[in-house]
Amino acid sequence: MNKTAKALIDFLYKSSILESGVTSKKKKTRQNTQNRKERKEKMEKVKKQAKIWLCIGIALMLLASIVVSAVQTSGGKVTMKELAFETDSGYTMSAYLFIPDTATAENPAPAIVVSHGYLNNKEMTDANYVELSRRGYVVLSIDQPDHGDSDVIENFVTFMPDGVYQAVLAVSRMPFVDTSRIGITGHSMGSWSCNAAINADNLNENRLISAVLIHCNDPIYTDNDGNFTNAYGGRDVGVVSAQYDEFFHGYVDDNGVTRQAPYYMEGKNAQSFLYFGQDPTGLEARQAHTYYTETIDGEEAIHVIFRPAIIHPWSHFSARSASYIIDFFEHAFGAPNPIAPTNQVWQWKEAFNCVGLVGLVLFICSFGTLMVFTPTFECLRAKEVVQPAKVTDRKGKLWFWLSLAAGALFGSVSYLTLVSWGNKMSVSQTEAMGLGLWSTGCGLFAILSMVVFYQCYGKKHGMDLAELGVKMPAKKLGLSVLLGVIIAVMAYVCVFTADYFFYADFRIWTLALKAFEAPMLKYLPYGLLFITFYVASSVATNCFNYNEIGGKSWVNTIIVALFTTIPALIIPWIQYIHYYSTGSMMWANNLATGVNLPMYVLWLFPIVLILFFSTVINRILYKVTKNPYIAGVVNAIIVALLTITNTCTTVV
């Protein structure tokens, strides 16, 4: 082969390689361009969907507020007002006043004061105030002192709060109230307040209270010497006694055996009450759900005990209990607008309170998503929608399941101990302290488990903490905290708007996001006890447990959320399965030590939903930001506010 031919072959060969290289480079460039375009389109789709969900969330909150307002005002037939009045005891009390159109100075109506229980507020009595006001009664639903929007006072006594009596004095001065027909009722601590009101009213020559319904508490059985008595005189008296009440209706029988609420009707206390204060020894046993009458001071009085087969906190969320309350006051006073006790509408209010809560969760997720598309916070947005990590080896899967199980186990075994410690401390809010200590403990355990996971497995398998969002520059972290605060503030703007225009809040049973007075903000430092857990939970949920285990992304989210809620599920399950099957609680109230274990178990009911949906919020915001701290801050602030505004605050 001559030199010319060889040179030609070399030229053609090199040209083909060069052309191939150029072609490959062009293909790669085109592929990268296509990938960027697809990522951008996916992010635009996320933005578009977030706008839609934001509108849906706002619409749900608005719809919920309108329906709630319509139900609690009986479609405009009842005027609802929020009052803040100075009591004769010198503190300011907050209350809702319901005035039916039929109640006037010319035609005064019977009035009923209703009270919530310990750690609750006036909004929790909605079944009572909705149903009683639609039947024509004037209703005053109060915030007890140290609760809700009422003043925090120095001499508050849990066993003898005077809120009910102060409310009785207030309604007795209203021109549209028939002062010969004033009734009182309260759930749990609210019934202690009712008994205190009876004692105060007994000192008056002209008594104001004509009827009292004790709800999930004990009536007065004995005098100061321990002898059976009828402290209520000629008043009509009823008792709603939950068959599985965790706190009341217990007694010691003749054999020295401590009996709990399931055996209440067999004891002397219940029988003495139904015999109007007589010693029931040797008398025929009287029955629940039967009205017994006796003439006292020339007037016929009634005593009755109702026994719904429910637990203590369910009674203020129960159609059966509501029907008993309606029926009792119908017997005592006669309703101005008689409606069958089973004809109830308060459930619609509660249902739409829950719709509003769903709308608020949608608002938080969608508003937070849209904020990272703004110029100020766009640096927090991920380059693409975050995808779950691949876990291909058996060890990785084992670490996933073991870490989730370990967290659930620690949360379960530590709960009662840590909450008890917090509740014994001399602080203004023992509930917030107890739950905060538990949250901190669980948060520290989560951090420890993540460190162990990273050192033993993640680091060896190329886990990049900066890439996952665990590590980030201080400026970006500060911006993340700021955005979290803004989202939480805007969520509460929605809550306050619903309260201002509609007297509505967003709740389901004992979980409630409600408006509050400015002084409550000084208790926000309790939030520092919650931040460790909710930030650590977000980091664990997204940076360590967001993977393909479970198949689809949403399945993985559900798995992680369910494991997070296990402590709040398993403890009540054990408590109530044991209670229903044996008639005694696994964790009973210890009066000697002051450790109220049944109360601590009840605190877990709203936490089930809090833990589940906070995990969902974590995941949704992480997928668009690759940043676990935004959602952690949002959840910590909201849970802290939810806790400090739905409890008892004392002076220490």
PLM segments and residue spans:
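Short, positively charged and aromatic/hydrophobic N-terminal segments
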Residues: D10-I17, K25-K26, Q31-Q34
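Acidic, Ala/Val/Gly-enriched low-complexity intrinsically disordered segments
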Residues: A5-D10, E19-V22, E38-E41
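Alpha-helical transmembrane segments of integral membrane proteins
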Residues: L398-V652
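Soluble extramembrane regions of membrane proteins in the secretory/endomembrane system
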Residues: G75-V345
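An N-terminal hydrophobic leader/cap segment in hydrolases
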Residues: V46-E86, S94-Y96
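Juxtamembrane interface at the cytosolic side of transmembrane helices
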Residues: L360-S403
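Juxtamembrane/start-of-transmembrane alpha-helix segments at the extracytoplasmic/lumenal side
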Residues: N343-L357
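Short, Lys/Arg-rich N-terminal segment immediately upstream of the first membrane anchor
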Residues: E41-A50, Q347, P388-K395, K471
